[in-house]
């Protein structure tokens, strides 16, 4: 009986480490080539609009806008912002529910491999994958992929598809204000429209633009260039 259990666990371990090795190899390859799809795109109930664009073709304020809005500590953390997680857990203990606290790297990992919803299991997987992305890809690639796979509307993925859909132009020609208007869609992209902003979202756009100015045009230069 003991030998049979050892044999079963041995086979499970053999399959698991081979799967992990294959996953790492595939992840490493996607450091250099555009990703054809993501978990969220495959799960989408809407027709998918998605066009890849190199981060080098984007105006510098497009990545700066999403960093200012979503994760200002992006250049400094290693995929997981433990300070933000600690605050979220304190709020959870106070009965406020499980909140986000996800970094851009974690959001990239979630969109690529996981599912929507909030649970400790998904958060744990998300954090582990985020550290893997930081290790294998680096900041510039993570930000490039995020800008290309984040959802900006019903079935609209990536800043190029979003810019074409909402503004009728390539993301390479976005203005600073348009970049900020796209950035504020990210928490709830299916219920927001950059051309029909509520008072709250207009205030949010103004806040993002102020944050962009405070961070400065060179804030992301060390990781993008």
Swiss-Prot record:
GO BP of this protein: cell wall organization; peptidoglycan biosynthetic process; regulation of cell shape
Keyword Cell membrane in record: yes
InterPro entries registered for this protein in UniProt: Glyco_trans_51, Lysozyme-like_dom_sf, PBP_transglycosylase, Pep_trsgly
Gene Ontology CC, one term: peptidoglycan-based cell wall
Catalytic activity: [GlcNAc-(1->4)-Mur2Ac(oyl-L-Ala-gamma-D-Glu-L-Lys-D-Ala-D-Ala)](n)-di-trans,octa-cis-undecaprenyl diphosphate + beta-D-GlcNAc-(1->4)-Mur2Ac(oyl-L-Ala-gamma-D-Glu-L-Lys-D-Ala-D-Ala)-di-trans,octa-cis-undecaprenyl diphosphate = [GlcNAc-(1->4)-Mur2Ac(oyl-L-Ala-gamma-D-Glu-L-Lys-D-Ala-D-Ala)](n+1)-di-trans,octa-cis-undecaprenyl diphosphate + di-trans,octa-cis-undecaprenyl diphosphate + H(+)
Cited Gene3D superfamilies: Biosynthetic peptidoglycan transglycosylase-like
GO molecular function: pentosyltransferase activity; peptidoglycan glycosyltransferase activity
EC number: 2.4.99.28
Transmembrane segments: 12-32
Highest rank taxon of the organism: Bacteria
Pathway the protein takes part in: Cell wall biogenesis; peptidoglycan biosynthesis
Subcellular localization(s) per the UniProt record: Cell inner membrane
NCBIfam families attached to this UniProt entry: mono_pep_trsgly
Family: Belongs to the glycosyltransferase 51 family.
Function: Peptidoglycan polymerase that catalyzes glycan chain elongation from lipid-linked precursors.
The protein's name: Biosynthetic peptidoglycan transglycosylase
Organism for this UniProt entry: Marinomonas sp. (strain MWYL1)
């Amino acid at each position: 009986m003991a030998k049979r259990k050892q044999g079963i666990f041995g086979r499970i371990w053999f399959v698991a480490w081979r799967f992990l090795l294959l996953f790492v190899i595939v992840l490493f390859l996607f450091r250099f080539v555009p990703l054809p799809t993501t978990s969220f795109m495959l799960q989408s109930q809407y027709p998918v609009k998605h066009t890849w664009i190199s981060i080098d073709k984007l105006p510098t304020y497009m990545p700066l806008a999403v960093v200012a809005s979503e994760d200002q500590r992006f250049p400094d953390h290693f995929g997981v912002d433990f300070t933000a997680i600690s605050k979220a857990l304190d709020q959870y203990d106070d009965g406020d529910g499980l909140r986000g606290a996800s970094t851009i790297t974690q959001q990239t990992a979630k969109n690529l491999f996981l599912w929507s919803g909030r649970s400790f299991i998904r958060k744990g997987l998300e954090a582990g994958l985020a550290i893997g992305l930081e290790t294998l890809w680096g900041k510039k690639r993570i930000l490039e992929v995020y800008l290309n796979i984040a959802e900006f509307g019903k079935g609209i993925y990536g800043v190029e598809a979003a810019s074409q859909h909402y503004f009728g132009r390539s993301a390479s020609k976005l203005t600073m204000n348009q970049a900020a208007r796209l950035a504020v869609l990210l928490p709830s992209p299916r219920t927001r429209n950059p051309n029909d902003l509520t008072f709250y979202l207009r205030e949010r756009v103004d806040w993002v633009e102020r944050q962009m100015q405070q961070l400065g045009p060179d804030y992301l230069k060390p990781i993008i260039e």
